[in-house]
Amino acid sequence: MFTGSIVALVTPMDDKGNVCRSSLKKLIDYHVASGTSAIVSVGTTGESATLSHDEHGDVVMMTLELADGRIPVIAGTGANATAEAISLTQRFNDSGVVGCLTVTPYYNRPTQEGLYQHFKAIAEHTDLPQILYNVPSRTGCDMLPETVGRLAKVKNIVAIKEATGNLSRVHQIKELVSDDFLLLSGDDATGLDFMQLGGHGVISVTANVAARDMAEMCRLAAEGQFAEARVINQRLMPLHNKLFVEPNPIPVKWACKELGLVATDTLRLPMTPITDNGKEIVRAALKHAGLL
């Protein structure tokens, strides 16, 4: 369940900014039908930063309900206060989620020892499998391979979403962890190369709109059929890049609406709607991918 194409799912909203249950069901049905390995609910792409704590939990629980056992659900549970991250994680104990994705603390920029103590404390307060999440471009904090190696010894820390885009991290981390510790790319543009170097899958933004292609690409890569996987990846490459032409999830949410997967591309402030120029850029990438 922690391999292959795992979608970092958008959180669909109605035109008033409330979570849209019908669009969420449509998205989940789409991923079930497309072969997506699992859903990450309320991560960065799911607008965790602009949902209240109650809403955060409610969206994860709604996702579980609508998934109805058809696809594994991973809860985003990151926070930059350890006690808060523990509380959020514990909310999902016995909920049915298969694990938690927990980002490094943002803004307060802890030391490597602080990162170790933070994630160790969270893991010690739950039996749920924990996926570390390193994305320094957003957090201002880079969890180094040596720290990952230490954390991999904690029994229920089972994987990392590595989103630096630095492919040398694959080798660096693999040298420090056991063979059953999973490495997941958090960067669509380098995801296939990441898998070719020994990674196990991708937690993907692109999969929101190209679920079947991402699932097939990851399947081929896992089977060592990299030439075939690269044909798909080259077709998706403009999309991998242009879904970040404006800050995520602005472009991907609009793309979901453009493809009829959600009713609106409503975001909550401070996120604002995609510009007209951004629409044209993303539309061209969707066409290149064969989605329009």
From Swiss-Prot:
GO terms for molecular function: 4-hydroxy-tetrahydrodipicolinate synthase activity. Coiled coil: none annotated. Its main location: cytoplasm. Pyruvate binds at T45, I203. Its EC number is 4.3.3.7. Gene3D superfamilies: Aldolase class I. GO terms for cellular component: cytosol. Catalyzes the condensation of (S)-aspartate-beta-semialdehyde [(S)-ASA] and pyruvate to 4-hydroxy-tetrahydrodipicolinate (HTPA). Keywords: Amino-acid biosynthesis, Cytoplasm, Diaminopimelate biosynthesis, Lyase, Lysine biosynthesis, Schiff base. InterPro entries: Aldolase_TIM (IPR013785), DapA (IPR005263), DapA-like (IPR002220), Schiff_base-form_aldolases_AS (IPR020625), Schiff_base-form_aldolases_CS (IPR020624). GO terms for biological process: diaminopimelate biosynthetic process; lysine biosynthetic process via diaminopimelate. Pfam families: DHDPS. Homotetramer; dimer of dimers. It is an enzyme of class 4 (lyase). It catalyses: L-aspartate 4-semialdehyde + pyruvate = (2S,4S)-4-hydroxy-2,3,4,5-tetrahydrodipicolinate + H2O + H(+). Pathway: Amino-acid biosynthesis; L-lysine biosynthesis via DAP pathway; (S)-tetrahydrodipicolinate from L-aspartate: step 3/4. The record marks T44, Y107 as: Part of a proton relay during catalysis. This is 4-hydroxy-tetrahydrodipicolinate synthase. The keyword Cytoplasm applies. It is found in: Cytoplasm. Belongs to the DapA family. The gene is dapA.
